[in-house]
Curated annotation (Swiss-Prot):
The gene is rplX. One of two assembly initiator proteins, it binds directly to the 5'-end of the 23S rRNA, where it nucleates assembly of the 50S subunit. One of the proteins that surrounds the polypeptide exit tunnel on the outside of the subunit. Part of the 50S ribosomal subunit. The keyword Ribonucleoprotein applies. This is Large ribosomal subunit protein uL24.
């Protein structure tokens, strides 16, 4: 089985490029490798009807649904737009992701 490589990590700021939340930005909460998805904070909100269980009341709950990883791009704060990332090696030998346009490092 192949390991999937994602250009996005938990905690990254991303921008949605297609769908109902197009051009909105948010922070990645979780990566879902089996579904090729990402959960983005405050985006792709869906309503779920839940049944009461124990102490939890039932009702309609709004929560984030996964977006396909191909529908989001890294957001560069310096460029202030969605950008592609490339790998670069720093002077100390550490590999980081950098903005293709301006060279700003995403990994600190």
């Amino acid at each position: 089985m192949l390991d999937k490589k994602f250009h996005i990590k938990k905690g990254d700021t991303v921008s949605v490029v297609t769908g109902k939340d197009k051009s909105k930005t948010g922070t990645v909460l979780r990566i879902l490798p089996k579904r090729d998805g990402v959960l983005v904070e405050g985006l792709n909100i869906v309503k779920r009807h839940t049944r009461a269980r124990g102490n939890e009341p039932g009702g309609i709950v709004e929560k984030e649904a996964p977006l396909h990883v191909s529908n989001v791009m890294l957001y560069c704060g310096k460029c202030e737009k969605p950008v592609r990332a490339k790998k670069a090696i720093l002077e100390d030998g550490k590999k980081v992701r950098v903005c293709v346009k301006c060279g700003e490092a995403f990994d600190k």
